[in-house]
């Protein structure tokens, strides 16, 4: 399955929440898209609920099925609660950290910046969006990329104290992953236990 590149509002309506950020369409059309979207909802099966939660997580973090499955398998063998470890791994992806630091306005934009070699880790260019950032590593903007409009606009007025597990130096345009976030600190509305139940079948 290829990464979804269609209207984000359509996906937001599918899940009934702005998984890509604030969505004005939801205030007007808070029901699923399609011909029968505004009709009475049918009861969803347990499997359907679990699958929906997995899809929500994949869309939120912009991860393909194979990548998501691989992350789950790693989380399942790691120390800790599988669902929480899975979310922590998703949060630790380079593209997500670039987004959380305010360098990019969306995760999709963050993936592009990483892929186009605008981002560095510990001073070295890294162009792999799924790169797993470790605590203590420095995430920065390549010198020649600091004047890019998308980066400047995204950083303007961004609240860098928003996430306690990240640190930002405005002068050097460098951020730092202080520690892996606890589940309670991750703001995404994802019921990870449903994903664990789905993969455990």
Swiss-Prot record:
Pfam families: Ribosomal_S4, S4. Residues 28-47 are annotated as: Disordered. The keyword Ribosomal protein applies. Disulfide bonds: none annotated. Coiled coil: none annotated. One of its GO terms (biological process) is translation. One of the primary rRNA binding proteins, it binds directly to 16S rRNA where it nucleates assembly of the body of the 30S subunit. With S5 and S12 plays an important role in translational accuracy. This is Small ribosomal subunit protein uS4. The lineage of its organism: Bacteria, Pseudomonadati, Bacteroidota, Bacteroidia, Bacteroidales. The gene is rpsD.
